[in-house]
Amino acid sequence: MIRIYHARILTMQEDQEIFDGEIWISDHKIQYVGPENKEEAAKIAWERQIDAKGNLIMPGFKNAHTHSAMTFLRSHADDMPLLSWLNDQVFPYEAKLTPDDIYHLSKLAIMEYLTSGITANADMYLTPDTMIQASEDCGFRTTVIGAVNDFTQIGRASCRERV
């Protein structure tokens, strides 16, 4: 088990203020959140104990609108009008991505999310299966929404037929 003690804890329960306490974790699940319990803690052979003095522990954030694999385009062609940016910069790069590229870019994004306290997202991108696999491989929670664009010749022809 893991014990995190001397922590300031925010639980998001409506009737509870931030309090000083500790958290016990076993098998990747929180077993206890509450005031420090030194007497009970002394009876346990801890795998790890973390002194969180001066730190706040709070629930993870959720990002409700992501395009995770687009991390590689961050700061690429900034300060452009949206349609120019999409049509002239983003779409040509995305058209060359393989599912394997998208998988690894999604894992990169997940690592960035986790270091920022984001523990779940809703992701919209070209190949939802790759985000699902990357999320499973990283132990990350995600909801995926398929893309509405298709850069393949078949996809373009199909869109033209529908219009």
Language model: regions and residue ranges:
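N-terminal metal-binding scaffold of metallo-dependent hydrolase/deaminase domains
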Residues: 1-43
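Divalent metal-coordination and catalytic microenvironments
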Residues: 7, 23, 28, 54, ...
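Hydrophobic faces of well-ordered beta-strands that scaffold small-molecule active sites
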Residues: 62-64, 121-122, 142-146
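Active-site beta-loop-alpha junctions enriched in small/polar residues
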Residues: 67-69, 126-127, 147-152
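Alpha-helical scaffold segments that flank or form the walls of functional sites
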Residues: 74-140
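Metal-coordinating catalytic core of metallo-dependent amide/deamination hydrolases
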Residues: 132-162
